[in-house]
Amino acid sequence: MTGLYHLKPDSAYTVSVRDGEKEEGSISLRTEAEYVTLNVRQFGAKGDGVQDDTHFIQAAIMACPKNSRVLIPEGTYKITSLFLKSGLRLELAKGAELRADTDSSHFPIFPAAIQSYDEKAEYHLGTWEGNPLPMFSGIICGVGVKDVVIYGEGVINGNASKENWWNNPKVMRTAFRPRLFFLCGCRYVSLQGLTFMNSPSWTLHPFFSDDLRFIGVTVKNPADSPNTDGLDPESCKNVEILGVRFSLGDDCIAVKSGKIYMGKKYKTPCENLNIRQCLMENGHGAVTVGSEMAGGVIHLNVEDCLFRHTDRGLR
């Protein structure tokens, strides 16, 4: 999977595919118009790997107007949790790295479930292995947002190791470990081209979210890292996973829909998942259904994928 970057806004391009001198095909396209680009350096981010750049990047995100883009240029940006907003376009340029802090006391906590005033409903945020449980907020978080595109040639590094998040990984210390990328109740979210690595726990975890696209993304975690699944859609609908490269220490893709409590209460399956042209290596399972699947799974398609050195292909 090859991405195209550094294109000008509102400009026409023709992309051709050639076999030597012979043109096999072409497609014409026009990039979206753009009002302004907000460079996070203009908001105070240094990208020196020392200053905590969380608030400066978050300010750029919140200030970004419609039909505009937040740009994170080359540099190493120390962060805790960044929160997405609807309509956001966020680009991580080549050489840009978001590197997570590893001090859990610096992270917000997502409570497990908050009771509604009429006591007839629950608002779920924190989740751990299919149950409503408190967790630290993800490095990149989206809650109730829609129409978001995050793309580029940059890296999102959870910075996890056995000295921090991977130490006694099954023990809840105030809250459970954060995800590297977490969505809750979101729609129309796309990730394109980015590299995700060294996740504290599950790497990409969309939860009760629909109409998602993961295209040309790379997920890399050490082979001995605990519970660092690559992509775990949980009770999600209409998910496209195309050209993603996985190399990690657990399941590459684990399709989920909650344990008994969540499955019985919400009866929300994972539905309409299309997995194509992905490379999955060094994991326990390439594509697995469960565990945590009390809500069921409907219409899962896997085609043209390569499984290399995984313990199991399909489970």
Write out the residue ranges for each language-model feature:
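Extracellular/periplasmic carbohydrate-active domains that bind, remodel
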Residues: 1-315
